Amino acid sequence: MEDFSFEARVLNTPYEKADVYHSLSMPVYNTAAYEFDSAEDMEAAFCGRTTDHAYSRITNPTVQYFEDRIRMITGAMGVTALNSGMAAISNTLMAIAYSGANIVTSRHLFGNTYSFLLNTL
């Protein structure tokens, strides 16, 4: 896929995971929780010992497909999709800053960004 043009990668990124209803395109999984065969399987998923989806705020098939598709299209090493502006801002700031770091900013920021900087970092 790397040899294809950007447009070809966008249009031809395959849907490789068949769902139980044989959908031709990736279905939207609008659920919060997932069923497990046993308590041990559930524990393994929540502890990250498997790639199973455990809870949609952590991951779900739709978001994983989107991240994989963006990674394939762009050639990025990894992609993290977030579902709100504040999630994107807080994740970015936590990746580049640390507690006690000096950050110069205005009070006029998106949502609770100023409060996040003041009280969390």
Segments the model singles out, each with a brief description of its role:
Residues A33, S38-A87, N112-T120:
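Conserved N-terminal alpha-helix of the aminotransferase class I/II PLP-enzyme fold
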Residues P27-V28, G78-T80, A101-N102:
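Structural motif
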Residues A95-T113:
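Conserved PLP-anchoring active-site segment centered on the Schiff-base-forming lysine
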Residues M1-Y29:
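Short conserved active-site loop signatures built around small residues
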Residues M72-I73, N91-S99:
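Alpha-helix C-terminal capping segments
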Residues P14, A32-A33, S84-G85, L93, ...:
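Fold-independent oxyanion-binding glycine-rich loops
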Residues I96, T120-L121:
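Active-site catalytic pocket residues across diverse enzymes, especially alpha/beta-hydrolases
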